[in-house]
């Protein structure tokens, strides 16, 4: 790869930018067609003024490589590398001093063989059997003798004291695993274990609350552009635009009257260009330009928001047994036992197990140099390097093509008269030039010879009418001379003094729009606007590009204790301990703490282009046209006195350029001209001398990654640090799956204005400006960020091991491993290589709270949080007015028993009822006083229900009782008669946010009550649906800043504004202050959530919540009583043949002639002895016909059980079963028996064979249309049809011919066999609102419907309890019948079928309704 030095890179970069700019410039200039080439002029040696620089030439070919620059100064040391891999073992250390002598051993022998066998290479050193003979004097070492017979085993000597530790060698490479030890003896029986493992999981609990939304995911690729949305409504009228650029010239005015002929003047030389006129008024805005070409496809879009979590799947099959876990760490060694007394000599034993390890041998020789360690983490930025030497100047580029005509320079002073030129060839007539300022009249030239007649020039535009001159004296008539030859041009007259400026002309017609000017310098920062009203949260926008990397934070406090290292090599097994009691299985630990923040990710893709810049201000007027052709020579006139200033004539057409005049002498410097267009980028100048230090620069962009520094040396092992405060928040994880949407939160208070955002990303590169003057040298800038990764450096010297991290928290207890075999104790190995980071352990105990950190800058808005828990209950308010009568309450707990009543007469024995499901466990009542014991009477008949007593006074709220065990759900009781209105109940806990009501008139603020005791937290209610937006209330006092609201949707792009005028080009200003923030960059990835705000004051106590949803199913009840013995089953299959019986008595003689036709076989058994059933004689078949018929009948019955046909005799369990067995059957009425008992209770349903739904018909199916309810009360409330209205009834379902309650039992089973239910009802209305109130624009008067588990479904609110209107024809009072069709669909099958309906908009004499109840369908 070619490596370029800095100067060459700069030149290439400059050429690249210039080429790009040139291409852009060429696109921007749309020139007219090229004219024909003019004839060559005959101008001799006239040097024109120096032209403006030409446009940049094409990039030259790459010049030859420059000489190598001087070696730069040494860079700052690189960042510390990561710890290197463990090195090879070091050289052996010196041997330790000898241990003290052991006690005398038993009789000697030749131990050489045992010594030689005592080396165990795997243990890493020489392990000597500790078998000492009697201690003799040390002789010289003899050669090894032949192996002797093994001597008897000596007693184990006392262990020698450990030698001094040798110098620690470097860590050796990991050895291969040793062979498995022999299985150990069985250990002693363990103590009885603790309680067994946790039992099987209970039944599935109720659905949990939605989880908190996951952290925002990493930004995905940019999506393709969506289809165009529908056209939005017209926006509000925009602010008045800036004035437009000048319009095109108007058409010439009518021709004036012809002026008197003047004397024919001699054409003066072209005057110098006039001074720049004042800017004209801007013209109107030009029409919008043509639509640009379609852009290329965008990047892939960010992944969409995660869908709602699906329903919990069924539990999967149990997995196979996992692989055996890794062996645990070795236990700590036990204390050494005391030495025993010597015993008598034993018989020679078998060879003993290997003795205790000897002292570790000296370290080995140094190993070969290890491979380079892995790349270290990027270190901190090094200090800025010193400036390099200037590079060699590049070669001169090729001459560029001729530049465009520059603007006219200032008018020069008049030059001295030139020498007379030779006569030129006759030029083609030029177009008329613009009128130059009048020159002073030149001195009369000598009369020339008469010239030939020239060709007639084109007719000039009519001149303005001159003022009347003074009448001259009449001359004598001369003879007409013949036209002479044209004379030589006279000497050039002196340039006249410029005339005074004329009066300001009238404003001309608007010119054509100018080209866009360059953007002006940024204006001063405007005053901060008032905070706007908070908008509604929009849908989530696409994830923005990642924000700019923040500055490096301060070093964090010490981190938490590190995770456990990877298990070391399996140590030698200790001797088996007694078996401990089995521990109870621990609960799953809490999830571990978040990990540390990861390293910064790679730079993101480039951001999208910035918004189109603001319209520039109008450009300057163009330079004047070139001088026109020379006119015919006139007769010299006398110099007239200057006339008065004429009126300004209409603008003439532009002339074609004249030929160049002779070069004038240099005039004095004119005033500086207007700013010219930017010149091309010059070649880099030579390097200036170092300037003095400037002010501190802004933070630099991230540099390229520098080369990896040499790894630092390993530090010594540090002490275990204290547990640090929690680390910073981890980097955002990948986007989790989106949880189900949380309930809507209430609108937060308006947030305080945020701090000024960071400067946005730089816009696209502008055109290169002209080189500025050398600035003052800047001060040394901040250290830059780390550059991109350089080439890998040479491996550094091996560093010492780093300090081990603090011990991590204990991991989750693993399952008990299989019992390992007892291995021989190994010698201590060298420390193994550092393991990989283990998985996070379970949470340690919480550390002490760290000191509060400084408040961070406001982070970007976090993802929308869940609705918070209800606040502390506020103080009880003042007694409110009595509320509307409550709905019938749940039965209260049993009161204390009363004294026994007198015995009633014996009643008749009732029918045996169905065994009810166990009810919920009631609270225990107080025991009543014992009554006098009466004689047992007969069981009385049930008495009639008594009237409901008057409501009791409201009791004080009780303290929270212990939670009872959840009972099984009881079957619904029969509805009681409607109770009288009770007194207002105690205010309940705060419920969920209801639907947004219509705005009331603001009431006067009440005084806050004192704070009451904190109530028991109610069940979490369902979030209400968002109501329609009320009109704005009066502005409240400013609240404490609420949490940041959710990010709104990215609005649709507005219509493009009109193009502004082109401005004047300014001078290059001094370095400005940092500009105001640029247009927002794309949204960065969401930052971590900001710190929580201060806790708000307790909110007011909310209204009481709705009843909570049913509790989770209770534990499985005790087994029921033993059932009755079953009926006798069908006969079993025939048994195996019995053993042969004893021989029978001899039979009578047989007539063999019957079998004469069989013939006699020569070989084989007698054919009569082995008759098969299918070969039996026809006489045997008489009896088999019944058997065959029975078998066939049984076969048909079994087949019909396996594949029911939906008849009354053979019903299916559900329509889904019928569809599976007979997919080709059509939808229609079939019989099903969900409880699978006797088929006599089967019921007839409609089976939708396309979906498999079982639809049960209502009975009856209609509520007649009439006026069901009259009320003079003006207060509207929902009235239940079955419970309250006279003649109303609860809807029932199933076949009317079935025994009472049979349909309910069958429906209970059908609900259990189904996962989804749906039902439609049609509400026929006359002057009654069913769903949407068109006049009010809300759903306040919508019906309520009651499900079979007494849950009410509404038109709005929590989506799980809302129904939908498929058709709504009851939105206003028309005096005619209309209808609204309502559908409720739910996966909670217990809520269906619908059993009652409550309209609100009824009670008037002209308000009637009726209902068609549709079948309830289960799938």
UniProtKB/Swiss-Prot annotation:
Residue positions, PTM 3-hydroxyproline: 602, 839, 1076, 1118, 1133, 1139, 1145
Subcellular location field: Secreted, Extracellular space, Extracellular matrix
PTM characteristics: Contains mostly 4-hydroxyproline. Prolines at the third position of the tripeptide repeating unit (G-X-P) are 4-hydroxylated in some or all of the chains.
Cellular component, GO, one term: cytoplasm
Region span, Disordered: 28-1168
Modified residues (5-hydroxylysine): 122, 219, 231, 240, 306, 540, 552
PROSITE patterns, A to Z: NC1_FIB (PS51461)
Any single GO BP term: tissue homeostasis
Composition skew (Gly residues), residue ranges: 292-301
Residues where Ca(2+) binds: 1233, 1235-1236, 1238, 1241
Residues carrying a glycan: 122, 219, 231, 240, 306, 540, 552, 1320
Secretion signal span: 1-25
Molecular function (Gene Ontology), one example: extracellular matrix structural constituent conferring tensile strength
Compositional bias annotation for Low complexity: 124-135, 150-171, 242-252, 267-282, 335-363, 404-417, 554-563, 638-668, 765-780, 809-846, 1080-1089, 1103-1113
Region (Triple-helical region), start-end ranges: 133-1146
Annotated function: Type II collagen is specific for cartilaginous tissues. It is essential for the normal embryonic development of the skeleton, for linear growth and for the ability of cartilage to resist compressive forces.
Family recorded in the similarity comment: Belongs to the fibrillar collagen family.
Name used for this protein in its record: Collagen alpha-1(II) chain
